[in-house]
Design a protein with these regions (language model features):
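Conserved glycine-rich cofactor-binding loop
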Residues: 76-77
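Active-site helix of classical SDR
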Residues: 184, 220
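Substrate-binding pocket helix/loop in short-chain dehydrogenase/reductase
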Residues: 160-161, 168-171
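Residue(s) in the substrate-gating loop at a strand-loop-helix junction
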Residues: 204
Length: 323
């Protein structure tokens, strides 16, 4: 049933791996109490917010027990779309989030017809103030309980920092970092209280090195890595899995349509579907970092050996805009 509801090429990659991800083992807290800071937030904390701020009216409340779901942001393209295809194997209900209703409806139709899964569609632009509050309210109004949270929404662009607009920098940080943090804050307490759940935060190998001419984007991915590492340790005792996905370049139609298709770099890219398989498997195993692909692993390894000034110089030489 269908109901209405990264990043640049450098952000996504894949891993040589066979098989499909298994279902994450559910760990339980037993008699261990949940700290006060992890208690569930007030479900009606923002009654004054307009219902249609994100582009759709809140779904009508449902009766009965909450429906467990996997919520995927940035669901309509690249890694996000492939993650949806993987998650339907272990989740009967998907909540997909994106900016384009048309693309979301197309994806929902595809998933529901191919996998016989219940798909809920939510339109939201995370760069807009208050968008997360409205999304969370809509999800709860639909009687959905987020069992797996996938923070995949994000974007980036290349330009000298001093020459780029502050408004665009703010939108990048809001989308890549603040929205991710707010969604974790909204749903992690419920997961901890239940004693199970999973959070997959999509970072990038870009977060391991400085990124001249893409400084804010690289820094935003470093935040995702650091934040996920801390969250991993805090939520692990409560049975909640946390994984930071740190891919490198992903294979896109560009490689098939351009002369670059047979270059060495093109051969090092991997498909988004293989990235998704690696990510879901890592989350099931509660691995903190997932860096799929040869190139991604090489970048991560090299970042630990090379001085940061050297790494910054190398990134600058690759990313400096041509005049």
């Amino acid at each position: 049933m269908v109901l209405p509801e990264n990043v640049m090429g450098v952000v996504s990659a894949g891993e040589d791996a066979e098989g499909r991800a298994g279902k994450a083992a559910e760990a339980h807290c037993g008699a261990q109490s949940v700290p006060e800071r992890l208690q569930s937030p007030d479900l009606h904390a923002h009654p004054e917010l307009p219902a249609d701020l994100t582009g759709m009216a809140c779904p009508l409340p449902k009766q009965g027990a909450p429906v467990l779901c996997a919520l995927v942001t940035g669901a309509t393209g690249g890694i996000g779309r492939e993650l949806c295809a993987e998650l339907v194997r272990d989740h009967g209900t998907l909540a997909i989030v994106g900016r384009s209703r048309e693309r979301l409806d197309e994806l929902a139709k595809h998933l529901s017809e191919r996998y016989d899964v219940d798909v809920r569609v939510f339109v939201a632009d995370f760069a807009q103030p208050g968008a997360i509050d409205v999304l969370v309210a809509q999800v709860r109004a639909a009687n959905l309980q987020v069992e797996t949270l996938v923070n995949n929404a994000g974007f980036g662009y290349d330009a000298p920092f001093a020459e780029s607009s502050l408004e665009r920098q703010r939108a990048l940080v809001q989308t890549n970092d603040m929205a991710l943090m707010e969604l974790c804050h909204a749903f992690a307490p419920d997961m901890a209280a239940r004693g199970h759940g999973g959070i997959l935060n999509v970072a990038s190998v870009a977060g391991f090195v400085p990124g001249p001419y893409m400084s804010t984007y690289y820094a935003s991915k470093a935040f995702v890595q650091s934040f996920s590492s801390a969250l991993y340790m805090e939520l692990r005792p409560h049975g909640v899995h946390v994984t930071a996905l740190c891919p490198g370049p992903v294979r896109t139609p560009f490689w098939d349509n351009a002369d670059a298709g047979e270059t060495a770099l093109a051969r090092l890219t991997i498909s988004a579907s293989r990235v998704a398989r690696a990510a879901v498997r890592a989350l099931a195993c509660n691995r903190l970092l997932c860096c799929p692909g040869v190139l991604a692993k090489a970048i991560v390894f090299g970042s630990r050996l090379v001085p940061r000034t050297w790494a910054a110089a190398a990134a600058a030489s690759l990313q400096k805009p041509k005049k």
